[in-house]
Amino acid sequence: MAKRQKQELVFGHPGRKFNMAKISVSVLSDSEVNDIHEASLVILRDTGIMVHHGETLRLLGQAGAKIDEGNNIARLSEKLVMDSVAKAGKKYILYGRNPEHQARFGYGDFVLMSSPGQYMWVDSKTNKRRAATLQDAHDAIRLGDALENISIVGSMAQPEEIPESYRSVFLTGELVKGTTKPSRSWLYRGQAADYVLEIYRAVAGGEAALREHPMIETFMEPISPLQLPKDGLDIVKKFVQAGQPVSIGPMAMTTGTAPGTLAGTLAQENAEILAGVVVTQLLAPGTAVTYGGIPHIMDPRTAICSFGSPEQALMGVAMVQIACFYGFPVYINVGLTDAKVPDAQAGIEKGTSMLLGALAGADMFGHCGICGT
């Protein structure tokens, strides 16, 4: 297994970069990274992963996984896991409607993405929260298209006027019309994936053109603890068969859906990501994967995740190190805050975690524009 070397950190788009290669941050030693890796392999071998998808469960069984059909659990051997890691693509480029606008993964670039959409919106006039609207989405798409350092544009709003049953398809259409950059929208159902891929085929110029120049990656979120969801697997299958990359990122939550220690959370998070990698490579060997290291801690007062905690930043740095151990480009949840409005708290929490993630060498930083959880 080829460990990914720490690359020079650059800001901005190709041709306009700011080098920060002389500064780096880490929180784990090499032996600690290996300990987490070994613990994840034990989890997958002994506890296994629950797979809510009959076809995928059978596919894993055919590949040598031990299947507990009564409980829909697949137990994965070290060989199956590491062979899948070796097969996975680890560098790729997403292209915008204007192919000069690119988001490059695995090249050491600093990729920022505006949020694919939230249900609530902080009104700029009242500073109060309200339901997001279609006008908010249009404004956010225009803003993301105009901001030089945003590489991937999201709608930032889930407008209440658009029925949820086809909202992701509708917003995909608005994105490809409203920006010439790569874009992303949230997908929740396999049927929506069919329509979204058809939109991008039309923009790219057909099936072959989209394969040659990918324009969209899907995001699969394993459900902690240790589950792969049916809808997510339906979507992944359609995307990898269309030759598009996949980002795999569970939101394991310390003391909630993951162990009460950060190390335990990292081991579980890593196991869930590796299980997703195995599935992508069984479906389409060579599929490019981004390692979505996005664990959080639970605020025991509210029982929801904390976006602005110190632990959030520490685990983000650790996840970069673990992703580099396997050679994957890495996406982390930093640049977030627990503040409910854009204020000093928001600036401090966002800035601190974003800086640490950047200095650790992450590839992508998502959900720019979010306040609160």
Regions picked out by a protein language model, each given a short descriptive name:
Residues 151, 250, 283-293, 329-334, ...:
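Glycine-rich phosphate/pyrophosphate-binding loops
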Residues 340-373:
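C-terminal catalytic subdomain
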Residues 21-25, 302-307, 335-342, 369-373:
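Short beta-alpha connecting loops at secondary-structure transitions
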Residues 261-265, 301-311, 341-351:
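Short glycine/threonine-rich loop-to-helix capping motif typified by GTGT followed
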Residues 1-135:
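Acidic/polar, glycine-rich intrinsically disordered N-terminal extensions of enzymes
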Residues 73-250, 254-259, 263:
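Catalytic alpha/beta active-site cores
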Residues 275-331:
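Phosphate/pyrophosphate-binding betaalpha-module
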Residues 175-182, 267-278, 315, 355:
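Acidic, His- and aromatic-enriched active-site or binding-groove loops in soluble protein domains
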